Amino acid sequence: MSQLSTNLGDSSPPESPVPAVHSRPTVLMRAPPASSRAPPVPWDPPPVDLQAPMAAWQAPQPAWEAPEGQLPAPVAQLAQPPGLGAPMVQAPPLGGGMAKPPTPGVLMVHQPPPGAPMAQSSTPGVLMLHPSVTGAPLAHPPPPGTPMTHPPGTSMAHPPPPPPPPPPPPPPGTPMTHPPPPGTPMGHHPPPGNPMTHPPPGNPMVHPLTHGAPMVHGGPHGTPMPHVPITGTPIAQQPTPGVLMAQQLTPGVLMVQPPAPGAPMVQPPPQAALMTQPAPSITPMAKPPGPGVVMIHPPGARGPIIQTPVSGAPMAQTVLPPGQPLATWAPQGQPLILQIQSQVIRAPPQVPSVPQAPQVQLATPPGWQATTPNWQVTPQGWPATPLTWQATQVTWQAPTIAWQATQPGRQGHSTIRTGHTPIRPGPAPLLRQIPPMIRQIQPVMRQAPPLIRQVPIRPAPHGIASQPQLWQVLPPPPPLRQAPQARLLLPRVPGTGQVSTVPPVAQIHLVPQSGPQVPQTVLPAQLSIPIPVPQAAAQSAPRTVHCPPIIWQAPKGQAPVPQELPVPQELPVPQELPVPQEVPVPQEIPVPQEIPVPQELPVPQELPVPQELPVPQELPVPQELPVPQELPVPQELPVPQELPVPLEFQEVQQAQAVGWRAPKVPPHFWQPVSAQEAQEQATQIAHVEQQQPFQGAPASSKALQTQLPTHQAQASGLQAELPSVQLQPSWQGPLPMLQAQPGASATLANFPRGSTRSRMAPSGEPGPSSLEPRGPPRERRAPARDKKGPPKERMFIGATFCAPRGASASRAYVPTAWKNLPATSETFPATSRVFPSTSHFQPASSNAFRGPSAASESPKSLPFALQDPYACVEALPAVPWVPYPDGNASSACKSVPAILMVAAAAPQASATAAEASKSSEPPRRPGKATRKKKHLEPKEDNCGHRLSSRDWRGPRTWGNPSHSDWEIQRAMQLLGDRESLYTPQGLNDWGCPNTSRMPRSLEGPSTSRDQEFCGDSGGSQTWMASEVPSVSRGSSAAQEDPDRESQPLSPLDERANALVQFLLVKDQAKVPVQLSEMVNVVIREYKDDSLDIINRANTKLECTFGCQLKEVDTKTHTYIIVNKMAYPQCNLLASYLERPKFSLLMVVLSLIFMKGYCIRENLLFSFLFQLGLDVQETSGLFRITKKLITSVFVRHRYLEYRQIPFTEPAEYELLWGPRAFLETNRVHILRFLAALYENQPQIWSCQYLDSLAELEYKDANAAAEESHDSDDDAHDPTSSPHPH
């Protein structure tokens, strides 16, 4: 060891006497002798213990260090061993001089002579690596003072730790390890006080290999180890399977090659234990390949070296110097090399794949990643038990090594930095300091919230700033847990501003210099900024985890800070610039509403010159010339009554036009005008209606009341003048119905006849059937004295109503008679006969479009503002509608009706009306009605005259054949026969497009329904038509009776009309409607009759639009509107959705159907991706496709999106929704697929049979319902099904 002591700066203790025998160093990797020319001899199994004479390092060795600033000496690369079994270059012959280690930090372990006492390392934390016999478990030394566990079959003596005697010195001439030349970077020595031991003098310790000498490796696994062959003889290489790589943050890997198979391994003794050493090796050690590499080679000898189980020789354990990296296991068959590697654990590429061993988690200080997932166990038949046990011991001993490495790093910064500045500038010491900091950070972080709640917040920022990377692992907090002020401050920050302001605020956490001001600056910012910004989640999410307690405590102690940082809150410039919101010019410029010039030009109304000039009334020339009245040939020839058969069979006669005429006057003049002016005024009304949606009462009732007094005053006189044209009530005699000209056939005789299914309220009360006029159940049950008169105010609302979906369906029922009606309009002269009895207008049906009363004074009468884009109304003057059967009807009724006339109550009463009511009802005392049952019945006027809602006037003929154009439009309402759910008239308010039905007119309180048109004679009922496309219309075939007063809409019907509008608006957004929503928004105070109102609205929807209200959820009572007309063709889907969306929906529904009505979300998205549609990307057609499928279609109830139970992470599946089942069927889906694939549906046999079974089932149910409904109509009209 004198060579070691002669090195520069050698501070080792003085050499001790060493035995003279076995002077050659023990080389763990043997090279053949120089004089040997024999072929390679297989190695015998290595000795029982790879106990290299690793003497403890007792003091720093400056000889291993190079002067500061000097580059290391050039290092020759070690020749890489070839593949398994390939010949390998041998080491130089035995006895050759060993070159000085060119690379600093190389630990060469040599074997001492057998039986020589070894200096035992007194420092804990040394990893002893001993080869073992194949099959013998590998033993590892326990910590100091721990009793040893022996492997099976091995006896171990544990003598007390005597002072370790020095090992014998090498024989003369033995090449020893020389220190590197000056300037070679060496390992750092530990600071003073480090319990590291140096080898005693003369200890044959580590010898570096000769420069460029190749390393000798053992043979492959399972092959007997060859003896050291002659120099230059190829030797087999050992694959070295089962490499354990214990990685540390500091670069430096110890790769230890396991021994040859069959070599028994004896567990090393505890500290200072005596152990038998193997025979000395005479093979010189090759030069290490690189700096800082420890090469531990198994000993090789000419004969098998077998270690005794128990030995009295002390074993010398090596203690790595402070700068020495920790040990790992070398992969493949490479020499036992301690390489300075990166922190990446590299898996051995050539080791065959074997069952994965459990990961060995080394108990290391924080920051030392020691898992070895790539450690392949038991390759090539190597016993798994020794390796597994060995891993356990390594795991147990690793903490000691880490603990040893931590202290020197903290204590020796100055020495390490001065000696190894060129090579190791210092990241390793910094990394060694991190573990204690990490241990301290956690308690600081735990204490941070309470400290922030209190005033001193200083410890928190240091913990946050010193370890920012730990925050990255924490998940973002839920946004709903933020403080109230956070939610209040966020809306004022624009979305784009939040993203831009998050990074600077989030980075405040990383500034440790901010001191105690950091929490005061950062926390308020987190209150307002990083929470809603998803882009900053990667950075701000970790920092936000600990913020909820801070946020909740911020208002207490740090309220001014959010006030100091409301800059993003004070920068809601986009919100302060809601110019589009502040410039609702279209809302403030309802010029069409403010320019109801006909309404704003009531100058003729204010100039009641026509009223003051009752010249037309004083010119009863038409009354004196009652040529039409004296020509009641239609009345005297009750052709409609005598021709019921062809009308009932619907297809007997083609009709010429029948003019339903009412006096047409300008909306603001009570004077006769020319036909051209009337057309212009009608056009203006139509334009205003299109521009002005129905927002309540477009025109005040007071403006219209100015028109009424004169006519009301003239009522009694006019009635006296026309006794011959007044008709008796329908129940008092044969009612002269709509009479056609003698030469004209019935106009609408060929209207198709609708179904006779009765309508029933959800409560079980009957609605009117197709052929039976019925009043509401309440009205039928109510006595006559409970019925009230009409309200005092009345106005007409002309509205253009276009059916959005029922139009196409109803066009199919348009008779040719209407198509042939001429469009010529004539002006009816405003003579006294224009208003023969009163100024009341009673539409032919009480079911004309009756929204909320336009002239009502309380908001309750308008529960819902009818803002449907399809309905517009216009206030029109009150004029009576009287059907006018004339030969010119065909020339006057060609125009398609486009204005819906709405009649409200009128404050009118006459003696004739009172007399008419007396004929069927007991007299009632005059005055206001005292009944308070929610105004469900007509009210009684001041005169005490009360009219039932069933009492209507019959149509009255007029002498003057001229008529206006909008009375022709009104004719459509008169042709309808569908009555409301509570009135016996033909059509409901919405002009139900029911196919032809038998007309129902006046029904007396005590007469049978079959006499309502024909009187007591029991003659056949007269006819009525019902359908015109895209127009809602009322109806009445009843001839207007001058002795009876018109009645207002029932409040239930008003609410039903408003509910229809509400449902249509909701259906445009495809949003299901709940019963509670309908009650709260529309029905309101009539909630006791909510089911009745809903049933009426359902009937109106079905008759007018071909839709039906369906309940899709019985628990929440959720309803949707389903199109019945387009069921087999599934046209509703295409009409509602845009074409691309409809196609996507059909593809999704088809795939779900083919997969058994259920498909996983990921499978669906992968299928769409194969079609070229990425659901994650934003496209121009669907925006975000995933959101369209999983949100929009689900909200529309086309799809059902639910989580698959017991899935982690959560997975979802898609199914058909209730709307899909209602609007389409399996047959249609199969046809869609067949058209898509250009095949027949029969190729999918299973789905095809399933679809046929569903179709047959539905047909059977439909037939059963038809038969049941026919029985109900014949016997019990109250059994219509609930609209489910």
UniProtKB/Swiss-Prot annotation:
Skewed-composition ranges (Low complexity): 675-686, 761-773
Basic and acidic residues composition-biased segments: 775-792, 937-954
GO biological process: Arp2/3 complex-mediated actin nucleation; negative regulation of DNA-templated transcription; positive regulation of actin nucleation; protein K63-linked ubiquitination; regulation of circadian rhythm; retrograde transport, endosome to Golgi; rhythmic process
Cellular compartments annotated: Early endosome; Cytoplasm; Nucleus
Residue ranges, compositional bias (Polar residues): 1-10, 406-418, 702-717, 747-758, 839-848, 993-1008
Residue segments, region Disordered: 1-51, 114-208, 406-431, 673-717, 747-792, 839-860, 913-964, 986-1051, 1261-1284
Disruption phenotype: Deficient mice show reduced embryonic viability, neonatal growth retardation, excessive weight gain after weaning, and increased adiposity with altered metabolism, including increased fasting insulin and elevated cholesterol, in adulthood. Mutant mice also show abnormalities in the circadian pattern of feeding behavior. Deficient mice show features similar to those of Prader-Willi syndrome in humans.
Domain MAGE: 1052-1251
Subcellular location, principal: other
Compositional bias (Pro residues): 39-48, 139-150, 158-203
Basic residues: bias regions: 925-936
Key words of the record: Biological rhythms, Cytoplasm, Endosome, Nucleus, Repressor, Transcription, Transcription regulation, Ubl conjugation pathway
UniProt GO MF annotations: ubiquitin-protein transferase activity
InterPro entries for this protein: MAGE, MAGE_WH1, MAGE_WH2, MHD_dom
GO CC annotation, single: cytoplasm
Entry comment describing in which tissues the protein is expressed: Expressed predominantly in late development stages and adult brain.
Role: Probably enhances ubiquitin ligase activity of RING-type zinc finger-containing E3 ubiquitin-protein ligases, possibly through recruitment and/or stabilization of the Ubl-conjugating enzyme (E2) at the E3:substrate complex. Acts as a regulator of retrograde transport via its interaction with VPS35. Recruited to retromer-containing endosomes and promotes the formation of 'Lys-63'-linked polyubiquitin chains at 'Lys-220' of WASHC1 together with TRIM27, leading to promote endosomal F-actin assembly.
Oligomer and partners: Part of a complex consisting of MAGEL2, TRIM27 and USP7; directly interacts with USP7. Interacts with TRIM27. Interacts with VPS35; leading to recruitment at retromer-containing endosomes. Interacts with BMAL1 and PER2.
Name recorded for this polypeptide: MAGE-like protein 2
